[in-house]
Amino acid sequence: GNFSGFETMHYRSYGESQNYMRLPEIFMPTEFLHGLYDGGHGAGLYDYWEMMRKHPRCIGGFLWVLADEGVKRVDMDGFIDNQGNFGADGIVGPHHEKEGSYYTIKQLWSPVQILNTSIDKQFDGKFSIENRYDYLNLNTCRFLWKQVKFPLATDASLSLIHI
């Protein structure tokens, strides 16, 4: 709906969202992705977020839902019943354990973005960085990184990892 110049409709498609951002109202969908429909938010977030960041009328949006939902069954030794996959749609699990979407969202919404998409043999140790903070200069931040080489499946020295 439209509330005092804010367009807040839930779950507009990607194309509809682009159209709404061209209207005079400020675009802030109160829910624009639902974890149930993409396995927990991470799958569709990048495209939506990049579109929203580029439109001056968009001021953000909300994801549904933070934590997996379910009923703790006393008749099943505390098993959390969410009727299959109907409540397992959160950014974190039912005990607030971090799930895959948590890390995706953390990376996509980080105010410091590493723009290098790949590191090749000519890599000189320098990264291109984008500052998405509104009021903070990156000279006040400290960055640590480590370059590692993971073994390839074809490496002769590859050994089994025992878990």
Give the role of each language-model region:
Residues G35, K54, P111, R132-Y135:
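Short, well-ordered loop/turn and helix-capping segments at boundaries between secondary-structure elements
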Residues G61, I105, I129:
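Conserved, mostly hydrophobic/aromatic
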Residues F86-D124:
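Non-catalytic, glycine-rich low-complexity segments
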